[in-house]
Amino acid sequence: MLSLVSSEGYINLIERRVDVAIRAGSLHDSALRARHLFDSRLKLVAAPNYLARCGTPETVADLAQHTLIGFTEPKTLNDWPFADSGNTPYPAVPHLVANSGETIRQLCLTGNGIACLSDFTVATDIASGRLCELLPGCALNAAKPFHAVYYSDNAVSPKIRVFVDFLAERLGGQKED
């Protein structure tokens, strides 16, 4: 049986009986095996109707005058890698929060504010004009790694290995020996 669980929060694979999780950002649990899948840059985006109604920010400091959409957890997802000068990420204080990147994307698409989302999530929306990229010249050079993680034991199930190999091949990672 295949069961998919969607969560932006940290889950304990053993407690939840999860075979494989996709994690974004730095990995902290050394008890897990990890396979790099791809890197993704973050982009600030808003819908054209939001920008027509509220104006387009011209600097990172201007974001303080806008409705920001962010994550409930982890809070580090609200440290946006954008700066007018220096390398300090912008500490976004969201007016709307959600626990799902897809929910945040939908809130953004419907003109509810500005969000910071992974480029793989919003690339099609930007290309089609449904979302506008904001302040690309202020982006810090920070790509977020995405990994498949799974419990580390001596005998990884062949099904898990094949699935992780498939993800890595499909998403651009390297095949594990």
Residue ranges and their predicted role:
Residues 1-33:
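Central regulatory/effector-binding core of bacterial HTH transcription factors
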Residues 3-7, 134, 149:
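Solvent-exposed beta-strand sheet faces enriched in polar/charged residues
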Residues 19-21, 43, 68, 115:
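Short, well-ordered beta-strand core segments
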Residues 31-42, 46-68:
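Flexible hinge/capping segments at coil-to-helix
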Residues 35, 61, 105-106, 161:
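Alpha-helical segments flanking ligand/cofactor-binding loops in enzyme cores
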Residues 64-86:
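Secondary-structure junction motif
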Residues 89-134, 139-141, 150:
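Hydrophobic hinge/microswitch elements
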Residues 123-128, 138-177:
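C-terminal effector-binding regulatory domain of bacterial HTH transcription factors
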